Amino acid sequence: VVYTPAIPKDHSELNFFIDKHYELKKRSEVLGMITKSSYTIGIAGTHGKTTTSSMVAHILKSAGMNCTAFLGGITKNYGTNLLLGNSVGKKYTVVEADEYDRSFLALYPDLAVITSMDADHLDIYGDHSYMVESYRLYAQQVKQGGRLIYKSGLQLADLEVEKNTYSIHGDADFNGDN
């Protein structure tokens, strides 16, 4: 039985499975197992996860890539939060890497994207510095030969991983301009 931290510990159905000794796994743990066998793009951040992961999945699908995606919201163009690729050939998996409950620490992406690290879920982290430290741990879990891409200005420049920054202000490795 797969569950998320959004399910309260006193939820009757969750407790039924606990009482009957069913095997329970957190969603993040299952995602970690699923993504081991594919090229994984994990997108984290307090803002922009769903938009960014949906866009990346759509780009891969539109390019004809074998893409599976676990998204945080229902996309308008697909009408679902789960896109399934096939089991043939190179597989790409896009995962919305949720920072709540430190769930993203179950992932070891080939490409990690961090969009923001604003104070959020302080009921879990206690204060902003502990939350930032969890993001830093997530960034360091990029697989050997992988890469971290993050918004310029985030406290990640000192990490010893292959990395690039992005911005719309001209102060990054990749810059958006209109």
Model-derived features: positions:
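Short, intrinsically disordered, charge-balanced linker/junction segments flanking boundaries
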Residues: A63, D171-N178
